[in-house]
């Protein structure tokens, strides 16, 4: 069953479209990440779901209830939607317990019990209940913000780049902890982020927006391996884009012959490979099934490195190809190597000028 349904949602500001005819379904209990460059409309879409903005046309429904359509809209405070902004937005004049309990009704013992449950749920020690926001670490502040958003048992959780202000190591651990917590609570969740790796690891469903439109939506692995176009391919990670000639399930390109899944395709096209699909081998004279190249740059990042390898391209021009490898295999500039492809190339469409 789908929890959230967006149907042809459109929003303009001053006559300039910000969100254009977005239709998207989110299954109950799922995690959807919405990604896109700045100005793509992802935050405006999130604000319309929350009730901070209203669509010019279209329909937003949650668990069968229409939240907004041409007839009107349910106010934000009546939607039972949790919202965690980028900075957590804790009240500085309230301690942790008061922040979490803000908006909770009921008698004090019941309220205190619920606060204790929420502290335990987000893995915060009960001793932190009396602390002030400025006495907490960034990760602790985000956990308090999440507990506050969960306090009233929301039907939907909205996360607006909640991990972006955290240190790299803490960001990864917090992302995993929050994903696990929300899955255990069974709360349908939407994450808006500009971090592609974060979106790929967090979500069950990935939605890519560009210029206010939904470009592609589906399972993260599907979008990463089979993007709809070159822009989406490059937005979701490094990609090797090459012109090729297709025939009988093979693509003839600057890297040699690469298999493709679409055996019926024939003629000029553009193909995509991810850097991890390229294997660097020593240039020992055995060229079978590989392509010669020269290391032009090595971007060393500790446990990994990205090699820029020059190979002979069309018309005698050198084509630089990024290859992702273990940091143990970082090679000096000028090294002669061979490249072997792994798996199938993805066909993006006709090559420029084809």
Swiss-Prot record:
It catalyses: Fe(3+)(out) + ATP + H2O = Fe(3+)(in) + ADP + phosphate + H(+). It is an enzyme of class 7 (translocase). ATP binds at residues 36-43. Its main location: membrane. PROSITE patterns: ABC_TRANSPORTER_1 (PS00211), ABC_TRANSPORTER_2 (PS50893), FBPC (PS51242). Part of the ABC transporter complex FbpABC involved in Fe(3+) ions import. Responsible for energy coupling to the transport system. PANTHER family: PUTRESCINE TRANSPORT ATP-BINDING PROTEIN POTG (PTHR42781:SF5), SPERMIDINE/PUTRESCINE IMPORT ATP-BINDING PROTEIN POTA (PTHR42781). This is Fe(3+) ions import ATP-binding protein FbpC. It comes from Pseudomonas fluorescens (strain ATCC BAA-477 / NRRL B-23932 / Pf-5).
